[in-house]
Amino acid sequence: MLLLPQKDWHWKYNDSYGVLSVSLGSEIEFLTAYKAKSLIPDALSSMEFNISHAKFYMSLLDKLPKTLTLTDAAVVQIALNATAAHFMLTPQMPKSWFFDTSEVCVYSDVGKVFELKCQKQRALVLVVENTLQSALVMLLSPECVLSGAKTLGQFETIKVMHNRLHPLRAQRHVVAA
């Protein structure tokens, strides 16, 4: 069952775990992947989960199952982390040099899923913010090794130029006649 936004939802910084969280009522608190150093100053205090946040979250609840085969719990987890990333993270500069250039020109839009190729590995990413030349993407894969010293963890974000986004490989289904 998908969690739908309620008027008592709100953002708060969870000091015990050192991450941004979403209070989903009096009983449930969802912990995002985002630590204080990556958050905007307002995210360190209690904030309403407002209409803009709810619309963004709901659009992802709608888009994700059309692209990926996921459980309802995974869709909610991705959508809440992506909403936090879109509204609560500090701006980033592109770091495209970690990734291979795509041979295909893609239309990048918020909520679309792409692959990044880095050191012969493929990483699944979700666009959470889009500009004219670049996109802020959130890692859906468990991890992506960027270099010997840097690894991107699941739900972490990185900004890349559009020419680094590779379309998802088409699934081929063989039907016996």
From Swiss-Prot:
GO terms for cellular component: cytoplasm
Top-level taxon of the source organism: Bacteria
KW Cell cycle (keyword) present: yes
Entry keyword annotation includes Cell cycle: yes
InterPro entries to which the protein is assigned, alphabetical: ZapC (IPR009809), ZapC_C (IPR048372), ZapC_N (IPR048373)
GO biological process per UniProt: division septum assembly; FtsZ-dependent cytokinesis
Keywords: Cell cycle, Cell division, Cytoplasm, Septation
Subcellular compartments: Cytoplasm
Membership in a protein family: Belongs to the ZapC family.
HAMAP family: ZapC
Subunit text: Interacts directly with FtsZ.
Role description: Contributes to the efficiency of the cell division process by stabilizing the polymeric form of the cell division protein FtsZ. Acts by promoting interactions between FtsZ protofilaments and suppressing the GTPase activity of FtsZ.
Protein name: Cell division protein ZapC
Lineage: Bacteria, Pseudomonadati, Pseudomonadota, Gammaproteobacteria, Alteromonadales
